Every structure is written in C-alpha cells, then in structure tokens.
C-alpha cells in the first residue's frame, strides 16, 4: 500500500513555504511588481524537478502575467540557489513556473452558480413571467 503523504509531498510543502519567502523578501524584479502567491508545488518522485504554481494579485492583464512567469523562469537559478541554502536537500530541484488559474476559474464558477440561484429565486417569486404561451 502506497504512503498517502510521502517524501515528495512533504518536500513540496516545505518548498512552497520557502519559495514564497524568497519571492517576498529576495526577488526585486520590477516585472514582479504585483504581489505573487505560490499556490502549490508538485515534485517529481526523484525530487529532481518541481512545478511551481503561482498566482498574481493583479492577474487581469494577460501580458503582465506572461511577463511575471518569464521573470520567475529567468530568476529560477537564483531562487534555486537560495533554496539550496534554506533547505537541506542533496539535489535542489529544477524549478519550472506555471500560472495557476484555478482561483480565477473557481471565482468564475462561483459567480455562475450565484447568478443561476438568483435567477431561480426570481422565477419562484414571479412564476407568471416565466410561462411561455
């Protein structure tokens, strides 16, 4: 039976905290002027690769999001070196940054559900308006 919370998950969780601190305190790139949040980290089983999922505070502008991801990719070597100092790992994983749109999609879905519920309540209050011919 497989472990439910193995070493890759524990390392990913700790790495998420450390990368968030590094982005907050060490990275001074003007392309990352917007607040960056690390929403998740997925580790490979051999701990050699990490997918880092980030969100940005002002993520309405698609060009700014692309520039932010590009800036993070370019700074990945620096972030990796700081991770090596902060965490005791034999191999510091290669970092790949991705934009996490799950928060935006979740808010969109929530708004859709809210509008459907509101429309349904309006139909219950005024049933004559919704009858057709």
Curated annotation (Swiss-Prot):
Pfam families per record: RBFA
Primary location class: cytoplasm
GO BP term, example: maturation of SSU-rRNA
Compartments, as annotated in UniProt: Cytoplasm
Key words, A-Z: Cytoplasm, Ribosome biogenesis
NCBIfam families, per the entry: rbfA
Function: One of several proteins that assist in the late maturation steps of the functional core of the 30S ribosomal subunit. Associates with free 30S ribosomal subunits (but not with 30S subunits that are part of 70S ribosomes or polysomes). Required for efficient processing of 16S rRNA. May interact with the 5'-terminal helix region of 16S rRNA.
Name listed for the protein in its UniProt record: Ribosome-binding factor A
Species of the source: Escherichia coli O127:H6 (strain E2348/69 / EPEC)
């Amino acid at each position: 039976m497989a472990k439910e919370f193995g070493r890759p998950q524990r390392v990913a969780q700790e790495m998420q905290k450390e990368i968030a601190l590094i982005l907050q305190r060490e990275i001074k790139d003007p392309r990352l002027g917007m607040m960056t949040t690390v929403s998740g980290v997925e580790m490979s089983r051999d701990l050699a690769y990490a997918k880092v999922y980030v969100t940005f505070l002002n993520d309405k502008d698609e060009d700014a999001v692309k520039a932010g991801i590009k800036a993070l990719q370019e700074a990945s070597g620096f972030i990796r070196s700081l991770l090596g100092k902060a965490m005791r790992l034999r191999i510091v994983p290669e970092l790949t940054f991705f934009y996490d749109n799950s928060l935006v999609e979740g808010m969109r879905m929530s708004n859709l559900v809210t509008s459907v519920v509101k429309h349904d309540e309006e139909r219950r209050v005024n049933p004559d308006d919704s009858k057709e011919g």
